[in-house]
C-alpha cells in the first residue's frame, strides 16, 4: 500500500511492489492477478485503516462547525506525518485516466464521491438540528471543504509542514461564516 501511496499507480514499479511485499512477480500475479487488482486491494485497505479518526470526528463532533474543523485539523496531522507518505492515496493515487487504468480512476472517483457525501450528510445534519439555516447549501459547502482537503493533500506531497496545513485549515474555517450565511456556530 505504501508504495502506491508514495508513488501513485503509474509511478509504482513492479520491482518496487515486489520488493516491498518480499515476493517475486509470479507470486504477485498469482495472488492478485495484476498490478491494477493489487492497487484496488491497496486502496481498499487504505480506506479502512488510514484516516478513520478523521471520519469518526466528522460524525461525532457536537456541531457541524466543530465537525468540519476537526475533519480538516486531523487531515492536516495525518497528511504531514513524517513516518508515512505525505498526502492522501485516494486523492493522489491516479489522476489521469488517459495514463492510468479506467477502473482505477473510477474507483478513486467513487471513493472521493463517498467522502463528499459524508461531508454533505454531516452538514445536512447541522441544518436539521437548527445549527445552520434552512437554505444552507450543504452540497456546495461539502464541495468546498472536500476541495480544501484535496488541496492539503497536494501541499503535503509538496512538503508543506503540519503548521502550514493548519494555516490552510484556519483559512478554510474563516470562510465558515460566509458559507453558513453569517452563522458563526
Per-region residue spans from a language model:
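Helix-turn-helix
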Residues: 3-37, 41
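Hydrophobic packing within well-folded, soluble alpha/beta domains
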Residues: 3-4, 17, 28, 38, ...
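Hydrophobic alpha-helical connector segments
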Residues: 41, 55-86, 138-145
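Short, basic, alpha-helical segments at the C-terminal edge of helix-turn-helix-like DNA-binding modules
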Residues: 44-50
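Amphipathic alpha-helical packing segments from all-alpha helical-bundle domains
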Residues: 51, 66, 102-129, 140-143, ...
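Amphipathic alpha-helical segments used for helix-helix packing
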Residues: 67-68, 81-103
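Amphipathic C-terminal alpha-helical segment
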Residues: 78-81, 125, 145-162, 175-184
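Hydrophobic alpha-helical segments that form the core
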Residues: 86, 91, 136-155, 168-175
Amino acid at each position: 500500500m505504501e508504495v502506491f501511496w508514495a508513488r501513485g499507480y503509474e509511478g509504482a514499479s513492479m520491482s518496487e511492489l515486489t520488493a516491498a511485499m518480499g515476493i517475486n512477480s509470479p507470486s504477485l500475479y498469482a495472488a492478485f492477478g495484476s498490478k491494477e487488482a493489487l492497487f484496488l486491494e491497496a486502496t481498499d485497505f487504505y480506506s479502512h485503516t488510514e484516516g478513520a479518526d478523521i471520519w469518526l470526528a466528522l460524525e461525532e463532533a457536537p456541531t457541524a462547525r466543530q465537525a468540519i474543523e476537526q475533519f480538516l485539523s486531523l487531515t492536516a496531522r495525518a497528511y504531514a506525518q513524517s513516518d508515512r507518505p505525505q498526502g492522501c492515496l485516494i486523492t493522489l493515487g491516479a489522476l489521469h485516466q488517459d495514463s492510468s487504468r479506467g477502473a482505477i480512476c473510477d474507483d478513486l472517483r467513487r471513493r472521493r464521491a463517498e467522502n463528499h457525501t459524508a461531508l454533505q450528510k454531516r452538514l445536512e445534519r447541522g441544518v436539521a438540528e437548527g445549527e445552520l439555516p434552512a437554505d444552507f447549501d450543504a452540497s456546495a459547502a461539502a464541495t468546498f471543504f472536500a476541495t480544501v482537503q484535496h488541496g492539503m493533500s497536494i501541499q503535503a506531497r509538496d512538503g508543506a509542514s503540519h503548521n502550514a496545513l493548519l494555516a490552510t485549515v484556519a483559512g478554510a474555517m474563516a470562510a465558515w461564516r460566509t458559507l453558513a450565511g453569517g452563522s458563526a456556530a
